[in-house]
């Protein structure tokens, strides 16, 4: 299984995480003093959301909704490492999209980009648009741009 995901840029972040499963629970975030904001945001409403990819495993979307989460950003896919730069759909993308939608969560998507040329960026955009065609998203499409 590991070799299947070695080309996935997020897999390496997952392995480096101190948590053995790469997950922080909502209860950990909402603990007594663990979630704070600067005073300039006093009086501003907080909206809770999560982003998910294959590494979160099977998700009980009803539990997510009941925990107070209002939106979810789901990874559509990523560009693999190396010269091939293969565009890969997240194995859980459609399952997560269907489950989150059925649970009544607002849904958006993200793509983990490794594009280094305009042509690659355009190919990634087409890849995303092809996969979200026919779905009704309530949140934007995001591009996760990180140096790896």
Regions found by a protein language model. Name each.
Residues 1-75:
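Boundary/entry segment of secreted carbohydrate-active catalytic domains
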Residues 42-148:
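Substrate-binding cleft of extracellular glycoside hydrolase catalytic domains
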């Amino acid at each position: 299984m590991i070799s299947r995901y070695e080309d996935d840029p997020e897999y390496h972040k997952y392995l480096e995480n101190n948590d053995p499963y790469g997950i922080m629970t909502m209860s950990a975030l909402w603990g007594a003093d663990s979630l704070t904001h600067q005073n300039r945001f006093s009086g501003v409403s907080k909206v809770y959301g999560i982003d998910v990819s294959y590494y979160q495993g099977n998700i009980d979307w009803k539990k997510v909704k009941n925990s107070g989460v209002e939106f979810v950003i789901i990874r559509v896919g990523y560009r693999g490492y190396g010269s091939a730069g293969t565009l890969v759909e997240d194995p859980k993308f459609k399952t997560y999209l269907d489950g989150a939608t059925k649970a009544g969560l607002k849904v958006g998507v993200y793509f983990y980009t490794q594009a280094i040329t305009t042509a690659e960026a355009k190919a990634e955009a087409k890849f995303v648009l092809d996969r979200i065609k026919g779905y009704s998203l309530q949140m934007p499409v995001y591009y996760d741009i990180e140096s790896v």
